[in-house]
Amino acid sequence: MSHHLDSPASRRDPRLNVTDVYAFDGDGATVLAMIVNSSLAGAGRIPGFHPEGRYEFRIHLDGAATGQLTFRFSFAPADAPGAQLVSVDRLAGTQAGDDRAAGTRVADGRTGEGFSGSGLRAWCGAAIDPFYLDLHHLAHVLEGLQNEQPIDNGEWAPAQAASTFAGSQICAIVLEIPHGDAELRPGRPIGVWAAAKLATDAGGWRQINRAGIPMMWPLFRALGGDDDSAEYQRDTTAGPDGDPANDTERVAAFVAAAVRRTGVSDPDGYGRAVAARLLPDVLPYRVGTTAAFSFAGFNGRALADNAPEVMYGLVTNSAVPTGLVAASAAETRQDKFPYVVPA
């Protein structure tokens, strides 16, 4: 859960909290995965997906600033056993960002079961969270960064690391788009982010939150401390196209402060370079290639990638071991569809 509970609305209903987004190559297809509704939200959590919500994969093509392709998932209320009917609509061109557009229905199914349509394959349901991180270590990292001090792990040591998310459950939306798709052909650069929206009383839709690059919200968005501020809500409810103008100065200054004490020759320049890499908050991926979310570069994100360690290293320009490796959470993923492990 690299995103955490970032907005008041998503804290009230974690079904609308997008915690992670993944993009990687599957069996002759591009795989997109969106994670919501962590069991770590605690008592009162309602299982499944919000029947008055929408869950969207937003895709930017060829480096475009705005999305030109959307896959929208909608869910019916749960039946007695707890399953929900699912519909998937495809919206392209100007419709991709239009909440009023209906798009084209491409698949219908049921949670907990794989389903297909129009060459696509999808799975939605409860699964084991593939994300791994020791939140005790994150607390030490954030304390050091926010106080502009070296990271002091205290009594914590990498050898003692244990994932806080081990055994926790989430709800996953997994979509396979074949390489033969006219828009997502191999070799094409794309950018991916996900959004959760809720119907309004006025008949429209309100974006509750969004996610793209992992760890952005705990490391950067929450720095102000006031998640009810106008700026914070702007980042939550708007798309990422405004991120460079809105957040570059703040992110660059934060990173520059983090590396200034490590001897980087040009802290301000490094901060600007990192901000340019992170903003807009859209996960880049080249279709048909092996995904790797790494310090050297972002190319999608595989379920096994150690995103926190990469982001810590990028922000500090130094190695910050989390004590966990991909094998630490091997039981939470599989090499075949639906790639997550159903719970």
Tell where the protein language model's regions lie, with residue ranges.
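Surface-exposed extracytoplasmic segments
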Residues: 1-343
